[in-house]
């Protein structure tokens, strides 16, 4: 089970004060444990891509992070730049305010701006920031992500008021159906919580506690 879970983990370091030495360590751990990817801020994509060259570990980065309040054009440029630097997966934050305003056209256009640039080059995961949404908004966000061509929906940035819950994961899985990925992130710190997310329907886990999870320990990070 540990090895299977390792292949579902995006080994994550998104804090503002991350140093090169920490990114190097992250990549070494990802190689050692066989994680699906490392998830790093855009400034570290080229470094991580170089460190992981010739391995199965992908480089994942974040777009419009963590607020999602950039314009679609900005998110599209961030995506293009990240892919050019070696990103194979991008986790973008939706325009949460637009969703709450009922401006579904803008939400969809915003996601599509990233999807269009990434098509055939990188997987797109759409962060809905579930902790800020009502049930109806969570469903609508997932529906818009699917409509815009996303590969995954993702619960949280890990930088807002809450992280992943099995209930949100189950709702997201029910909404998107079997063919779209669901990523649980934020507060997944041990094997028990990781397994709960997977049982609820998650196919990827975003966490900075990947090593603790596969070693059966508990970490104390929020992401």
UniProtKB/Swiss-Prot annotation:
InterPro entries documented for this protein: Aldolase_TIM, DeoC, DeoC/FbaB/LacD_aldolase, DeoC_typeI
GO annotation, biological process: 2-deoxyribose 1-phosphate catabolic process; carbohydrate catabolic process; deoxyribonucleotide catabolic process
Active site: 91, 154, 183
Location (main, coarse): cytoplasm
Pfam families reported in the protein's UniProt record: DeoC
Cellular component annotations (GO), alphabetically ordered: cytoplasm
Molecular function per GO: deoxyribose-phosphate aldolase activity
Pathway(s) the chain acts in: Carbohydrate degradation; 2-deoxy-D-ribose 1-phosphate degradation; D-glyceraldehyde 3-phosphate and acetaldehyde from 2-deoxy-alpha-D-ribose 1-phosphate: step 2/2
Catalytic reaction(s) noted: 2-deoxy-D-ribose 5-phosphate = D-glyceraldehyde 3-phosphate + acetaldehyde
SMART domains in UniProt: DeoC
Localization (cell): Cytoplasm
Translocase keyword on record: no
Homology family: Belongs to the DeoC/FbaB aldolase family. DeoC type 1 subfamily.
Cited function: Catalyzes a reversible aldol reaction between acetaldehyde and D-glyceraldehyde 3-phosphate to generate 2-deoxy-D-ribose 5-phosphate.
Protein name according to UniProt: Deoxyribose-phosphate aldolase
Organism from which the protein derives: Geobacillus sp. (strain WCH70)
Upper taxonomic lineage: Bacteria, Bacillati, Bacillota, Bacilli, Bacillales
């Amino acid at each position: 089970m540990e090895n299977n879970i390792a292949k579902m983990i995006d080994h994550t370091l998104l804090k503002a004060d991350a140093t090169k030495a920490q990114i190097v360590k992250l990549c070494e751990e990802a190689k050692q444990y066989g994680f699906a990817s490392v998830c790093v801020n855009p400034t570290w994509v080229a470094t991580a891509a170089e460190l992981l060259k010739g391995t199965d570990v992908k480089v994942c980065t974040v777009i419009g992070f963590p607020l999602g309040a950039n314009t679609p054009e900005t998110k599209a440029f961030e995506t293009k730049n990240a892919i050019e630097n070696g990103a194979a997966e991008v986790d973008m934050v939706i325009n949460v305010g637009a969703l709450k305003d009922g401006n579904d056209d803008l939400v969809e256009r915003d996601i599509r701006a990233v999807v269009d640039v990434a098509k055939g080059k990188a997987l797109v995961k759409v962060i809905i920031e579930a902790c800020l949404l009502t049930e109806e908004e969570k469903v609508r966000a997932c529906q818009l992500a699917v409509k815009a061509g996303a590969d995954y929906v993702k619960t949280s940035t890990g930088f807002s008021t809450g992280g992943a819950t099995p209930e949100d994961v189950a709702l997201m899985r029910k909404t998107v159906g079997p063919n779209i990925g669901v990523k649980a992130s934020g507060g997944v710190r041990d094997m028990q919580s990781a397994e709960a997310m997977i049982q609820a329907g998650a196919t990827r886990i975003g966490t900075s506690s990947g090593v603790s999870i596969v070693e059966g320990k508990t970490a104390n990070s929020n992401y």
